[in-house]
Amino acid sequence: MQAIDLAYRAMKPIAVAALIVGLGMPFSAYSETAAPKCDAPLHLLRLANPLTHFAQKLATRGPITIVAIGSSSTAGAGASSPATNYPNRLAEELKRLFPTHSITVLNRGVNGEEVDDMLKRFDKDVVVAKPDLVLWQLGTNSVIRDQMFTDHGAAIRDGLKRIRTIDADVVLIDPQFAPKVIVKPEVGPMVELIATTAKQEDVDLFRRFDVMKRWRDDDHMAFESFVSPDGLHMNDWSYACMAKGLSLAIAEAAQRPVMSAKATSHMVP
């Protein structure tokens, strides 16, 4: 499987076909010490659908608002500081990719929450912000508490329905691949349920579980390299690598309508 370096160089304008094909800024820019290579296969990064609302704001050069809602993975548990959680890293990555655009990423993560908890605050934490893109991280806490969704994804669909009322793009983010998650028998069904719901509802999915699983299975990274000492949460390196991959996926999906057929054929494995 072809893998790509998730580093990149600034582009004016961004060449969409190059976004997910080895760009040039080394990940070690984030650290004074040697760090593992941040990479992922094309098929794990590429979002299924174009981000049309994000694309419209790019075209009109209007300010772009992104809401990242979720639990501790969004809040930043395991990060050494708020600056190194994934939403703040994502804001940095998108500003490098789109230096002439105003892009704001709002962190609406709350430790320990499940989908029903998030839905209770959707109005004040998502709807009021009038975002162009919603990143919804979900599923992990239900897995580690041995509480598989019994509604067959109805709660997720409820959230997606509410996001549609504000004309925002949405990307679901599935659980992390970490020791305290993968020991749970519910993790496989949860990852599958989120993927199935995303496909049925025609929304995008960032496959965090599979990206992190690849670090372990294919890159042979020790869990300590990308999981915090608690065995559950991500660390500075993995939050930054996740943000880098997600930024490239967002940028490509937001510009996909202008891609040529030739460029598309080279990007799809």
Task: Give short role names for the model-derived ranges.
Residues 1-67, 76-80, 95-101, 129, ...:
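N-terminal secretory targeting modules
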Residues 67-70, 173:
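Short hydrophobic segments within beta-strands
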Residues 69-71, 138-139:
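Short loop/turn segments at strand-loop or loop-helix junctions that form parts
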Residues 72, 109:
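Catalytic nucleophile serine of serine hydrolases
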Residues 74-78, 115-116:
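Short, solvent-exposed loop/turn elements at domain surfaces
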Residues 75, 85, 103-106:
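Extracytoplasmic small-molecule ligand-binding "clamshell" domains
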Residues 88-104, 113-268:
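Alpha-helical cap/lid subdomain in secreted, periplasmic
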